[in-house]
Amino acid sequence: MIHEITPEILSLDKSVYDEFDILTFDDCLYTQYLNHKHFAKFNKKMIFFLSTNIICPENINQSEQIIYCGNAHKKAFNGNFENYMKLSQIQELSKFYEIGGHGHNHILFKNSVYSFDKIKEDTDIMVSKFKEYNLDLNSFCFPYNQDNTFYKIYVKKLNLQIFGDERIPIESYIKNTKSYKPELKYC
């Protein structure tokens, strides 16, 4: 699982990537778009997980800043989407890679007071947005990599391949660097 694209991640040896069958990118951060060709050279299936309500408007200038995903979320939840991909970029990537679902609003449903109806509503909006955006939806990753029994039940009914906290953060291969943040797995 990859969030931020740091120089340390870009300099990891090919042998690290050989350990993965699939490379997954959470949140559709703009830096992931800028560097997708770097990861394509490892010849792995790649899935970019999209929260359909966190997309940069086409008329906004994007930031190439490497930003912790939690901080990017805070900015997005306050209306600033400059650290995320635009729909046109997501659609471009969909020609070569899979775009998976990551919820509509990127809500943390684990251990929450949210009802099954709220989970269903958020997921149904995500599904309808994928159709509206002409994107195939075959995979799903829980926001913050945290599942919830109701969430799992509903997503399974949609026949989506489910990804969660079983994924290994690529950052775990660079623990001794200043960019390592163990909390990244929760973005």
Question: Model features per residue range: what roles?
Answer:
Residues 2-4, 20, 40-147:
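Metal-dependent polysaccharide deacetylase catalytic core of the NodB/CE4 family, i.e.
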Residues 1-24, 29-30, 34, 116-139, ...:
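C-terminal active-site subregion of NodB/CE4 polysaccharide deacetylases
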Residues 31, 36-43:
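Aromatic-lined substrate-binding rim segments of carbohydrate-active enzymes
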